[in-house]
UniProtKB/Swiss-Prot annotation:
Family membership: Belongs to the HypA/HybF family.
Top-level taxonomic group: Bacteria
Protein name per UniProt: Hydrogenase maturation factor HypA
Organism annotation: Chlorobium limicola (strain DSM 245 / NBRC 103803 / 6330)
Chain sites annotated for binding Ni(2+): H2
Entry keyword set: Metal-binding, Nickel, Zinc
């Protein structure tokens, strides 16, 4: 389960930023994860509390927005949902497709509370 290492990296990043801001604690972390990013949101939710133990993010709420995978056909311009990184256009069967969303993995925001 690589989600634990991802959770640890997220906690490291948000903890460092919160310390720069002089925070006393982090109350919320918001992520954007595309369906093709190779990350299981439920596993990440499970790992996050353990990864956050002993940091400013301990007890923080983890909010994850999942982004659908969408591709555009380079031959006919048709936009369509994809479930795998490789797909063909359902309209013209071309393999000239470009994924335009669904690969995101972003820390959108953190909510911090001021330190003492």
């Amino acid at each position: 389960m690589h989600e634990m290492s991802i959770a640890l990296s997220i906690v490291d990043a948000v903890d460092a930023q919160a310390r720069v801001e002089g925070a006393g604690r982090i109350s919320r972390v918001e992520l954007v994860i595309g369906r093709l990013a190779g990350i299981e949101p439920e596993s990440l939710r499970f790992c996050f509390p353990a990864a956050a133990t002993g940091t400013l993010a301990e007890g923080a709420e983890l909010d994850i927005e999942e982004i659908a995978a969408v591709a555009v056909c380079g031959a006919c311009g048709f936009r369509f949902s994809v479930t795998f990184p490789v797909a063909e256009c359902p309209e013209c069967r071309s393999l000239r497709i470009s994924v335009v969303s669904g690969e995101e993995f972003v820390i959108r925001s953190i909510t911090i509370e001021e330190g003492d």
